[in-house]
Amino acid sequence: MNYEQAMEYIHAVQWAGHKPGLTRTRTLLAALGDPHKKLQFVHVAGTNGKGSTAAMLASCLQAAGYRVGLYTSPFINRFNERIQINGQQIPDEALVELVEQVKPAADAMEDVPTEFEIITALGMLYFAQQQCDIVVLEVGLGGTLDSTNVIEKPACAVITALGMDHVKELGPTLADIAAAKAGIIKPGCPVVSYGGAPEADTVLRRVAAQQNAPFTEVDFTKLQITGGDLDAVTFSFDGLDEVRLPLIGSYQPRNAALAITALRVLRQHGWNIPESAIRTGLEQVSWPGRFELLRHSPAFVLDGSHNAHGMRATVQSLKDRFPGQKFVFLVSIMADKDVDEMLALLAPLAERFVTVTAHNPRAMPAQTLAEHIRAYGCTAEAADSIEAGVARAEELGGEGPVCALGTLYFSGDVRQAFTRLNA
């Protein structure tokens, strides 16, 4: 088997009328020798900020001298990004070997595992074989029934900002969504929550109390944002002063405060994480596709916000970093998202829009999206391809800023097109 064949196998596994649940993942991992039982985890769930928070946690744990696995989704440029150790993506050869180990076990199962379940098994096997000290494990969707939730006793469960997303799968209210995320809270294991949504916080606190799990909520009164430019945002939090964070979204210091709180809880539970390692980890963190500046002048921003909750944070970042400026927006949005709410947030900042169709079956066609946008009194035109969209947005933007956003699923394509066009 080569890399292409391994990828083909992973992506060919379709969700064919599967019932959600952990049985398949447990069966598959048992056939592989239960690699997850040899590992320690920080489990990260939430609506927005999961990936950024996970990247910060992994970077700080690595700076503290640990061998750290990082499991995230989706990828931006290449599948291998989803499974990393100490910032290094899994090598192609290693991935092929793992697929060769996992495939026979999966094929032998009566109820065939889904793509995400296969990938979870690949990650667990790799991290165990590579003897990671700790793994930062990002939930795919929800919590309770997510395949990552086979882990029994995390060193810490971390719940990021909660908002309305995936309502079809998780339920129509914030309390329903919180209940799904609360599934990662395990008996006696510490929980650290972002908080800030009373309806959700009540649910999380109740579940933590039922599970006898020590519960900590981030104290944002101790967070001061002291500076921000196109290279870094500077903040102080609860005794850790003037940290220079290279993730420039205005919302990132809040994710960092969550990561710091979780790392300090881990320290209370015996992990050796000096404050100096937390600072180093945060100042060295990299997380592409989240309010990322591909070029300073004229500015080209790439952002992955894909629901109204995330879009609100991105719009605030655009206002903070580019005061008084209007943008050419390059957008693609999944048809099952709160499209109108997202567009209503963007419209006041828009010079005009260029729409494209991301390579995802759920993506709203560019033409349909452009019609939606015109209903807000904005100028919008549809491009035939992502590359044509990037070229047109750059042309319309002239010396002004361009921002590509609406889904993580087109970030990689936008970056590649941008690189080709500016080579």
What is the meaning of each model-derived region?
Residues M1-A16:
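Charged, amphipathic alpha-helical linker segments immediately N-terminal to NTP-binding catalytic cores
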Residues H18, L22, R26-K37, A63-E152, ...:
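ATP-dependent carboxylate-amine ligase catalytic core
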Residues K37-K38, I134-L137, L145-V158, L162-H166, ...:
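Nucleotide phosphate-binding/pyrophosphate-handling subdomain across enzymes
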Residues V44, S52-G69:
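A conserved segment at the C-terminal end of the G1
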Residues E110-D111, I118, Q131-I134, E138, ...:
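Acidic, Mg2+-coordinating active-site environments of NTP-dependent enzymes
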Residues A197-T216, L230-T234, A299-L302, A308, ...:
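C-terminal helical cap/extension that packs against the catalytic core
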